[in-house]
Amino acid sequence: MKPFSKNDRRRWSFDSVSAGKTAVGSASTSPGTEYSINGDQEFVEVTIDLQDDDTIVLRSVEPATAINVIGDISDDNTGIMTPVSISRSPTMKRTSSNRFRQFSQELKAEAVAKAKQLSQELKRFSWSRSFSGNLTTTSTAANQSGGAGGGLVNSALEARALRKQRAQLDRTRSSAQRALRGLRFISNKQKNVDGWNDVQSNFEKFEKNGYIYRSDFAQCIGMKDSKEFALELFDALSRRRRLKVEKINHDELYEYWSQINDESFDSRLQIFFDIVDKNEDGRITEEEVKEIIMLSASANKLSRLKEQAEEYAALIMEELDPERLGYIELWQLETLLLQKDTYLNYSQALSYTSQALSQNLQGLRGKSRIHRMSSDFVYIMQENWKRIWVLSLWIMIMIGLFLWKFFQYKQKDAFHVMGYCLLTAKGAAETLKFNMALILFPVCRNTITWLRSTRLSYFVPFDDNINFHKTIAGAIVVAVILHIGDHLACDFPRIVRATEYDYNRYLFHYFQTKQPTYFDLVKGPEGITGILMVILMIISFTLATRWFRRNLVKLPKPFDRLTGFNAFWYSHHLFVIVYILLILHGIFLYFAKPWYVRTTWMYLAVPVLLYGGERTLRYFRSGSYSVRLLKVAIYPGNVLTLQMSKPTQFRYKSGQYMFVQCPAVSPFEWHPFSITSAPEDDYISIHIRQLGDWTQELKRVFSEVCEPPVGGKSGLLRADETTKKSLPKLLIDGPYGAPAQDYRKYDVLLLVGLGIGATPFISILKDLLNNIVKMEEHADSISDFSRSSEYSTGSNGDTPRRKRILKTTNAYFYWVTREQGSFDWFKGVMNEVAELDQRGVIEMHNYLTSVYEEGDARSALITMVQALNHAKNGVDIVSGTRVRTHFARPNWKKVLTKLSSKHCNARIGVFYCGVPVLGKELSKLCNTFNQKGSTKFEFHKEHF
């Protein structure tokens, strides 16, 4: 290909380009030759590309074949002879109407004038080689056979010709630009780096005698996770070179890579077509479509789609081959790809206007450094004032207690021997006693749940109770180090080394015995209790860290039992011994004799009684909550669903959680799970994913009593009250408060769940849906009452009591998961929301990360089938619901941008449940948008 120079323009005579239409360049063999309708002249088709830099590239010059197309082509419905190309170029031959209009203005005046005379006849045709060849062959066969059969074939071909013509005219500049982002064989992440250097490095790693084998091609080009697709790509590229090879050298690999990495959409489309068209006949049959669907499903880990490949292949053929010729061509594949967005009109992303965004993000304009710093400070104070005042009060109390003990012991005789080491140790001990008492309050769950419902929740951040618990634990560690460090390294040595005079004058009345040795001090009640407490604290604090609690530390057997939730749970019960030792340690003090000076028990009395009372309440309350299992289901992804009867006295809010115990698994362990049923349901349901020892054993116990699913029901195994085997007994305790229960405070909700993290929000969606239905029923009842009151006379009856109007106007639910089977967990809820939410209050977005991002060639056909099936049947092929499934991960910055644009000046509650990494990202994004826009995002993360 070379640029199309000005001198070349004089050789061709083009038709004009009308607004909004794509024209086909046709030329006679000599300049200035007039066009003849009866086909006396020989025509050629010239295909050119107009690049973004206004350069013109000549793509091909092909002879054109005239055919007679009957239809509504001309105003008088008569046949018109039109030049149709026989393409020999592997690329597509289309350009946008706007670019042709620019080009036509640059042509010589006489050429433009001649072209305009024929624009009405020529502007609707632009045929490719495959159609012309197929049409000629089929038409000849039909003419030879004669009769009605040949006429039917001709009619089918002519009908397809008209569809092709319309499809090519519809390929506007905007659709072509969108297409450039599609059918990528190399992901965007790889494009951001020097991909060829990586390929060369891989070539050097896998090459043998200067060649890499077909089996290593996938790893070489970075497609190791979709090896089957890479092998088909290798074969397609080899067929383009008329070869069938098992190995290629470095130069051939570069050639393959250049084709794969080609920026031209037409080139990528041709490669994709060649992958499907294995017999190279220019046609794709239903069997070939089925094979590529199975290949794409395998590459994207969609096992169910693979099983339904035949059904979806028939769907594609039905859409693209209405003439039932038994095959589709390249242009039809392109049409489906370019027009898929017209099918994807369900669960669309939020509406977005740049004007609204510019109004909402006024703060994005540049500010001075001082102004920016002051704005940041004001924002931090506004967003975190609850945390700031609570932490400030806590720190001030600790400082006050430390200074109180510091100066108190400075007046004692022992100070003359041990100095400031004693003062520091005693100050740290006082803060230690205070924090050992305070650390119990954040885990008094019943108390916290009750306080959430009081006005105190406006001033105290109860959502941060677990974080505050951890912060206090950190302060305890510091106090322990200071206290025991000063005693062992400073105070005890000074007592041992004190002169006889100093000991008798300043210390004898404390010990009432001869001067002790270092060992005497350590083996005394104070020393023994202190050392034991430190050992138990080290064990408990270590196993409570994130690395051990979440099994991030891999230990060899049998030490692997020291990691995981069970180790954390049981080791925390060592604090029962710690608190007993702490009280004993406070009784046997060296330097405090009167009972009222020994204040340890005073600090601990109330919190220990409160926490002990809560644990006792759990024991008796769990026994009073008599529940029986109604349904059990085990879904793909190792998720166990338990539906149980709802005790009369068990009242909860959406977003709350409860503790569950199964005596058949462990008579001691209680585990928290979000409630997935709505408060108005007559049952309680929870969803449990197998993540640890306890959940694994729980699933095993219930699997033994479950039965295979009946046809049409989801879930691998099921059980209910009719099951022959008796179901295991369950005990429940709760409900307990969680951040998500405050969703009613916000006008707009953004609910984000990762995997099983969707569970807190399912109850919220159900509750919202129930309220929506009630509001509609209430509106209908008022309407009926108004109509009836018009006909009533002298009635003094009251109008129906006005129910509380739902404050939430919009809810956006984003569910991100790795496995297709996960959508079975809440399929019923999603379908119910899609069916009953006529007002569009709830907008759901499912994201499947195992599928390659939209635009990747490996997921292109999946996207096409997804769009077609939903347009026809109203069901998403991936989730099996009416909610569209997006591929890869959401762009959270775009999500928040569109929300801030659509809901200016709104207060949006962002509720998240999932891994901490994304939680930090969302929290940071919320902070960024809050500083720069009028929309305020309030971030909440679930903690258990």
Curated annotation (Swiss-Prot):
Sorted UniProt keywords: Calcium, Cell membrane, Coiled coil, FAD, Flavoprotein, Membrane, Metal-binding, NADP, Oxidoreductase, Peroxidase, Phosphoprotein, Repeat, Transmembrane, Transmembrane helix
InterPro entries per UniProt: Cyt_b245_heavy_chain, EF-hand-dom_pair, EF_Hand_1_Ca_BS, EF_hand_dom, FAD-bd_8, FAD-bd_FR_type, Fe3_Rdtase_TM_dom, Fe_red_NAD-bd_6
Alphabetized Pfam families for the sequence: FAD_binding_8, Ferric_reduct, NAD_binding_6, NADPH_Ox
Protein's membrane topology: Multi-pass membrane protein
Stimuli inducing this protein: Up-regulated by abscisic acid.
Location of the region described as EF-hand-like 1 in the Swiss-Prot/TrEMBL record: 207-215
Cytoplasmic face of the membrane: 2-387, 493-527, 592-599, 766-944
Domain Ferric oxidoreductase: 426-583
Name assigned to this protein: Respiratory burst oxidase homolog protein F
Organism for this UniProt entry: Arabidopsis thaliana (Mouse-ear cress)
